[in-house]
Amino acid sequence: MTILVTGATGNIGRRVVDELIRLGGSDIGDIRALTTNPAKAALPGSVTAITGYLGKPDTLAAAFDGGDCVYLAPFPATIGATLELMVQAGVQYVVALSGGAHWADHADAIAASGLAHTQLGPGEFCENFAMWGPQIKAGVVRDISPEHVESPVSMDDIARVAAHLLTAPRAPHLGRMYELTGPVALSRADIARQIGAGIGTPVEVRPCGRAEAEDLLRPVMGDGARWYLDLFESDLEPQAANDNVAQLTGTPAESIAQWAARNRSLFV
């Protein structure tokens, strides 16, 4: 079996590569990693680096050729051409990072492609809360919507699910969209407090307005701060927790406190 991981040097793609190696590496099959610069990718020696970029579909035909399974990182701007190339190459199964809401067109294109697929729809990433790093160091988090309920999931858990799906019998998962969450739903205020618990530091939470929130987040997030805060001015639904990570991998998702403890250097 040949598995191609796209976005293989990105935040989640690289984790998928590492998880495939942990699950068996070459015993699973030929693991290939799509990257724009193989020389700088620093991939493990057992992984075959393939040059290409999802943003330039004309670089992808050779990458998909001979690929049985593909982990598809999200790149909505070229999703139509990318899916067509996978169909032409005879790709047998796609595990795609996707979702609902603003990802709906991307998800719909995958569902309509004719490819055997499973989609993963994570909510808020635990890693997004690194944006609070400077505030948590100061002991006070100011947030635009502290009572909004979320169930953040770590990128490591998302990658574990993707790798397990790529290597497990696929029939039960075909056509599914799995929402991926952490183990418990919390208000954003409680998320901040749980990060504090994970690193052993009390954290106070105060509500704030849009302008103040943007001023606090822009130094960390750049222009992404505006897009992120726009979400809270839309009809953003609370996110309930589920046990899909545990059901799909056999190991429960880590909590935000556990994630913070592993990433303590972001907050102290």
Task: List PLM regions with ranges.
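Oxidoreductase cofactor-interface core, primarily capturing Rossmann-like NAD(P)-dependent enzymes
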Residues: 2-44, 55-61, 65-67, 77-204, ...
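A hydrophobic C-terminal alpha-helical subdomain
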Residues: 211-268
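Adenosine-nucleotide cofactor-binding segment
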Residues: 47-48
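Periplasmic-binding protein-like
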Residues: 71-73
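Cofactor-binding loops of NAD(P)H-dependent oxidoreductases
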Residues: 51-53
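Generic detector of short alpha-helix boundary/capping microenvironments
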Residues: 1, 146-147, 238, 247
